[in-house]
């Protein structure tokens, strides 16, 4: 069996990756680091042989220092020398001109040799005086005897400074310093479409501000300045009419003139996708209900994937969505009719191979949203007789159902009721109230709510005949004024005692003191 040699990547691609991990092959490492046999020969051979003047491997193609010489001929007599640098004169710092000279009078050869002092006056100098010391000190006077020096006597002439006086003031010739003139330029460009401020104090240099000069006159009736009428710079520009036109032909807030409806072109490829128009509006809100049963835990904005076995024969709720395993998220665009179209791509799985792979065609499902019709306008009518209400002050509300009864407040047929029937019935609301008396720190007294009835003597029905005397004694009909419950309010201990009839019957007897 012949072995196939696989091609390896370029050395410049292998070297950066293998250098980090130190796993580079020897040939790639030597080639990239210039350590091959040829590189070693050039390194060691260049140490003993100098080939610098021949221009080998320089890549310039000039033939070394001497250049190329044609075969069978001689070198040209004209040689290219070095480039001569041209020296330009420098700009003088100051202007060059004739200096200022002091005029000098010509000397008369026949005149006197001694120049009179009036021609050139001499300044008068003050005699030299020694100033007093700043800090005077006390000096003791000593007498010093001067003795002549033995020998021949000699006289020392005394010479002082020559003083010349003149009554005229001194004249000094002062030569003014000459400086070269300076030129200061200022450029200013005005932009009529941009104003920075009313006044501009910009210095030298370019500026977009313009100076405005305001001239005010105090004599009334005079117009200062010039009136320049403005003209249209673009007379060919079309004029706009001031009338307002109501345009309702467009269906969007920012209509585009002459623009075609943008829709995905790949969806309408009939050779690739089957075009299926859906008429059920559930396709927009709940597309899953067209394929399988509803599941509330899903999101319509993502792709819908339906897991089903191809071998199982399951009918879809909608015939067009049979064998659909996936529906993409909705795409909104404009249809040919101008309505909004909602599109989804569906993948069918109606073919299953032996390897278990399910394949099938793809379909383009689209639904055109219908236009919204304008709302119907209903004319509102006034309720009741408006004219009669304005005149008589009554308003009658009538209903067509007949469930209401019309009642006139001015009709005297209404029955009159007595005042006694209108009086409220008195209700005894304080019948079962109990009075609880006690101090703040003591617990309230709980009294039994229901009083146990007690029997009178010879209770029953008795017939009394008038004018006859009864043989037996009858108790008085007037009830006893003794209360059943006696509460002593003045006693701080809040003690009480019950009526003997309220005491439960026991074997043990109670004694009251």
Swiss-Prot record:
Residue runs in coiled coils: none
Intrachain disulfide bonds: 18-24
Domain of life: Viruses
UniProt-listed Pfam families: Late_protein_L2
Gene Ontology cellular-component annotations: host cell; host cell endosome; host cell Golgi apparatus; host cell nucleus; viral capsid
Protein modification: Highly phosphorylated.
Regions of compositional bias (Polar residues) in chain numbering: 249-258
Motif extent (Nuclear localization signal): 1-9, 504-509
Region described as Disordered: 229-269
InterPro entries per UniProt: Late_L2 (IPR000784)
Biological processes annotated in GO: microtubule-dependent intracellular transport of viral material towards nucleus; symbiont entry into host cell; viral penetration into host nucleus
GO MF annotations, alphabetized: DNA binding; structural molecule activity
Keywords, alphabetical: Capsid protein, Cytoplasmic inwards viral transport, Disulfide bond, DNA-binding, Host endosome, Host Golgi apparatus, Host nucleus, Host-virus interaction, Late protein, Microtubular inwards viral transport, Phosphoprotein, Viral penetration into host nucleus, Virion, Virus entry into host cell
Major location category of this protein: virion
Intracellular or extracellular location(s): Virion; Host nucleus; Host early endosome; Host Golgi apparatus
Subunit architecture: Interacts with major capsid protein L1. Interacts with E2; this interaction inhibits E2 transcriptional activity but not the DNA replication function E2. Interacts with host GADD45GIP1. Interacts with host HSPA8; this interaction is required for L2 nuclear translocation. Interacts with host importins KPNB2 and KPNB3. Forms a complex with importin alpha2-beta1 heterodimers via interaction with the importin alpha2 adapter. Interacts with host DYNLT1; this interaction is essential for virus intracellular transport during entry.
Record's function text: Minor protein of the capsid that localizes along the inner surface of the virion, within the central cavities beneath the L1 pentamers. Plays a role in capsid stabilization through interaction with the major capsid protein L1. Once the virion enters the host cell, L2 escorts the genomic DNA into the nucleus by promoting escape from the endosomal compartments and traffic through the host Golgi network.
Family, similarity comment: Belongs to the papillomaviridae L2 protein family.
Protein name per Swiss-Prot or TrEMBL: Minor capsid protein L2
Source organism of the structure: Canine oral papillomavirus (strain Y62) (COPV)
């Amino acid at each position: 069996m012949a072995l196939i040699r696989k091609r390896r990547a370029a050395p410049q691609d292998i070297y950066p990756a293998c250098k980090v991990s130190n796993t580079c092959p020897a040939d790639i490492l030597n080639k990239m680091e210039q350590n091959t046999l040829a590189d070693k020969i050039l390194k060691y051979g260049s140490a003993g042989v100098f080939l610098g003047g021949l221009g080998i491997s320089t890549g310039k193609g000039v033939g070394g220092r001497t250049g190329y010489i044609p075969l069978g001929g001689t070198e040209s007599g004209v040689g290219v020398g070095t480039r001569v640098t041209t020296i330009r004169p420098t700009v003088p710092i100051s202007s060059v001109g004739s200096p200022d000279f002091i005029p000098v009078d010509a000397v008369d050869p026949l005149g006197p040799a001694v120049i009179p002092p009036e021609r050139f006056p001499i300044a008068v100098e003050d005699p030299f005086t020694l100033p007093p010391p700043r800090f005077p000190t006390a000096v003791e006077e000593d007498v010093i005897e001067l003795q002549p020096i033995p020998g021949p006597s000699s006289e020392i002439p005394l010479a002082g400074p020559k003083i010349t006086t003149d009554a005229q003031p001194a004249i000094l010739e002062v030569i003014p310093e000459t400086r070269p003139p300076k030129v200061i330029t200022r450029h200013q460009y005005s932009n009529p479409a941009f104003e920075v401020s009313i006044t501009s104090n910009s210095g030298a240099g370019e500026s977009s501000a313009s100076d405005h000069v305001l001239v005010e006159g105090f004599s009334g009736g005079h117009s200062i300045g010039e009136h320049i009428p403005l003209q249209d710079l673009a007379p060919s520009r079309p004029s706009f009419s001031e009338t307002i036109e109501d345009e309702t032909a467009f269906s969007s807030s920012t209509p585009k003139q002459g623009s075609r409806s943008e829709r995905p072109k790949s969806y309408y490829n009939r050779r690739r996708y089957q075009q299926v128009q859906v008429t059920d509006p559930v396709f927009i809100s709940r597309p899953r209900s067209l394929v399988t049963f509803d599941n509330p835990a899903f999101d319509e904005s993502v792709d819908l994937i339906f897991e089903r076995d191809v071998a199982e024969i399951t009918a879809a709720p909608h015939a067009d969505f049979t064998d659909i395993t996936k529906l993409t998220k909705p795409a909104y665009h404009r249809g040919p009719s101008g309505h909004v179209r909602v599109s989804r791509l569906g993948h069918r799985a109606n073919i299953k191979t032996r390897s278990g792979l399910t394949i099938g065609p793809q379909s383009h499902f689209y639904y055109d949203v219908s236009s919204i019709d304008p709302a119907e306008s209903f004319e509102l009518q006034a309720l009741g007789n408006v004219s009669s209400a304005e005149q008589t002050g009554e308003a009658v509300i009538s209903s067509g159902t007949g469930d209401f009864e019309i009642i006139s407040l001015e009709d005297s047929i209404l029955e009159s009721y007595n005042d006694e029937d209108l009086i409220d019935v008195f209700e005894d609301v304080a019948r079962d109230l109990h009075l609880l008396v006690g101090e703040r720190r003591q617990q309230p007294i709980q009294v039994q709510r229901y009083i146990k009835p007690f029997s009178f003597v010879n209770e029953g029905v008795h017939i009394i005949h008038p004018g006859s005397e009864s043989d037996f004694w009858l108790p008085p009909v007037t009830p006893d004024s003794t209360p059943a419950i006696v509460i002593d309010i003045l006693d701080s201990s809040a003690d009480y005692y019950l009526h003997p009839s309220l005491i439960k019957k026991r074997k043990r007897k109670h004694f009251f003191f």
